[in-house]
Amino acid sequence: FSPAQAADGYDVVETVARQPWVQHGHVGMVGLSYPGISQLYVAATQPPSLAAITPLSVIDDLWRQQWPGGIYNSGFTRAWLAQRDMEIQIGGQDWDKALIEEGDQVCELNQRIRSQNFDFERFGRAIENFRDHLDARRVADAVHKIQVPVYLTGAWQDEQTGSRFALMLKDFTAAPHVKFTLFNGHHPDGYSPMV
């Protein structure tokens, strides 16, 4: 959820759009939770080849998600961050561990830069009080820059991301078409047939 990650996403969109198998040179993005949130940041960078986005089960503010009401979210957020911290270690995911064990030297060399990653949970706990510079990472402050059609879904009872996302729906002011489907349900229901 950083400006560097959004820039990487811009590059991915433009790289994929230039592949010979991409019809008309345009791509869309779809994803639930982290991939949904990430595409909001990417779309705000306005990649020329991005056709539309479908973010599902997202949040509007990273800090308020981690510190709702000023109290550290030691439930889902802590567990989610701990899992990410484990996965970013060298060989921290089954697929990269298997590639290394099979002798993939490029994968092994790429994994060496993993030591540059920081402890997300420790970082999140350190931000006890909202700081003005955190606004740069507020999802809600980026969505007014999105200039492609948006289909966004979210559950009022989402046990992982909550319902605060609805506060930013009015801010999709530059998107030529928007459709928001809000429903009673849970986090993974963004993929369900009911939406």
Question: Language-model segments: which ranges?
Answer:
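Active-site nucleophile loop of the alpha/beta-hydrolase fold
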Residues: 32-34, 54-63, 184-187
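Catalytic histidine neighborhood in serine/cysteine hydrolases
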Residues: 173-189
